Each structure stands twice: as C-alpha cells, then as structure tokens.
Amino acid sequence: MIIYKDCITEDEMFSDIYKIIETPDGMCLEVEGKVIQREEGAIDDALIGGNASAEFQEDDVGGSSLTSGVDIVMNHKLQETGFTKDSYKNYIKDYVKQLKAHLEKTNPERVNTFMKGAQETVKKILGNFKNYQFYTGERMNPDGMVGLLDYREDGITPFMIFFKDGLIIEKC
C-alpha cells in the first residue's frame, strides 16, 4: 500500500486504495472517493487488507450510531476547516512559498514549472471556490496542505484535490 502524506506536516492525506488521477496540467492529484456509512468506532475492512475472521462474527446489537461521510475524509482522519475567499488567498500564498522552499531542497528543476502552474491552479480554485469544502490533516496544522472536496457532475461522486508537489509517498 502507498500512503500519500503532506510534505510539511507529514499528516496522512490519502492512500492508493482510491482512484487517483493526475490533472492535465500535472499540478494536482484528484482522488475519487465514495460517500459511506460506518458505525461509530468501527474499522473499515478495506483498510485492513485481509479477510474477516470466520471464527468471530459480531452480532448487530443495535444502539450503535452510524456516521456518514466521504471515505477519504473518514479513513484518513482529515479535519474540516473553513475559509473565506480572502483567508484562502492568504493561506495559499504562504503555502505556495512553503512548497517552493521544499522543492528547492528536494527537486530544484521542478521549481519554475511549479511556480508557473501554481498561479493557474490557484486561479481555477478561486473560480470554483464556492464548490469546495476544505480539509486539513489530522493534526490540523495551519501550515499544512488543505485538500479540496468537490463532487463530480453527477452530484454523487466525491473527489478531493491535492497539490501533487505537496505530497510525499510512503510505501507500507
């Protein structure tokens, strides 16, 4: 399994169990999820990577509460946050500076391409600002990446957008 983490906070943002598409401009990854329901405290079997034990079957006793939400958010403990358009502009300006500094250390030849592409990507984000819900990593570090949640044209399929250059890949 591959885990994608925020390069600044090292918070887990998503994994390769989802459909992942690179945007045509190469700046972002779109991660497609599903709206799910889960019992409070239950662990999704899809995250375990094995088969459920035949020896122990839990009875549905009732009384447990169901929560529903987007699987990417629930499985990776992303935390919803809020922005006005102006506060997002301030955040993204600082975040792009941090990513530039990160790239200067880790991938200097990518810096110019990233800076040009980031301007266009931010314009697109601001143009669709009202469509997004915003999520940080589990630690809610304000310096870290903010994933953008939107829905496909069908109005049912959720997807999240993450800056590709803000992610580190960890194989488990």
Swiss-Prot record:
Pfam families: TCTP (PF00838). Belongs to the TCTP family. InterPro entries: Mss4-like_sf, Mss4/transl-control_tumour, TCTP, Translation_control_tumour_CS, Translational_control_tumour_p. PROSITE patterns: TCTP_1, TCTP_2, TCTP_3. Keywords: Calcium, Cytoplasm. GO terms for molecular function: calcium ion binding. The gene is tpt1. GO terms for cellular component: cytoplasm. Disulfide bonds: none annotated. It is found in: Cytoplasm. Residues 1-172 form the TCTP domain. This is Translationally-controlled tumor protein homolog. Signal peptide: none annotated.
